Amino acid sequence: TPTPTRAHHRERTSRDPRTVSRSHAPTDKHGKPPKKGKGSKKAKVGLSIFCVLLALIIILVGCATGVLGKITYNAHKENEYVTASNLKSDPRVKNVLLLGVDARPKDKASASRSDTMMLISVDSVHHTIKMTSFLRDIWVYIPCKDMSQRLNAACQYGGYSGVVDTIEYNFGVKIDNYVVADFEMFQVLVDAIGGVEVKVTKAEAKEVTGHPKRYGNVKLEAGKHNLTGKQALAYCRIRKIDTDFVRTKRQRTVMNAIIKKMKSSNPFTLYKMASNAAPYIETDMTKSKLCSFVAKAGNCATSTHQARVPFPDTWWYDTINGNSVIAINKEENKKQLIDFIYNKTSEQLDKEEAAAAKN
């Protein structure tokens, strides 16, 4: 466990994620251990991850069109709760935390909870990009508040830097910078490229049009239509009529439609897209660091791999202080995360992913 630079006098119990282990695993109402998470299925791709990936595209276009000045830049803050020597780092591996939020608050003192936390590791050693998603319901210690809570609460208590501090403290990896994107950016981007063509089913149109409060007074009609940004966002958020798997399929449909539209867009449209969407992105990287990060990522983009925290067989559902959470074996997750980011080659990960796909 990293050594805190500020003393914490609160007594630690088996509920504290810094000390929880298999021997402290909770039991269900029948006195039996709950099922451990297998994690064999891919983590669901939420709308906020969708927006985060779009933010990367905007930064890429922004570097080429000179509109990065419209991005909000914050001063970089070092973690005061853990010393750098206790964090795993390598100058040849760049770690940037991407945060997806429902809306960025105008009052910087009170950030909203982060819906998505994805660590992008550009590994110049093994020439690959490694993406690690952190589930928001993981029960962790939040150092800025000196308390344990769900991981996504770290943003509310400590802002974007608070999320970085919390992940570093609990999982022992150095995070160099963060990038934040919100849902408003998605709408602006779609409108900037003139909308996206999507085929809407009768059930989807009925769900959105019939629930104005849920979808912001948006109207959809069945059939193939060119959707505005607001309509496309409502379409991506549909979830009541089917499963999460179908919802993520809708999101991929829109994502592909956006990429297709961008490929056929002229330079002026791409400039307009980047210029309009850039104000909805926030980071603690300078312009030069942003462009450097994009350049390094481009050199490694031929190989990409994904992981999720918690890793398979390292977690279980629990109820703590009335909260339904994901309890984890923290030391095992820390070990596997460091191994994934810094040690594993692309060939090793290809074999692991192929084996997992067969199970």
Give residue ranges: language-model regions.
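Non-catalytic, solvent-exposed segments at the cell envelope interface
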Residues: 2-359
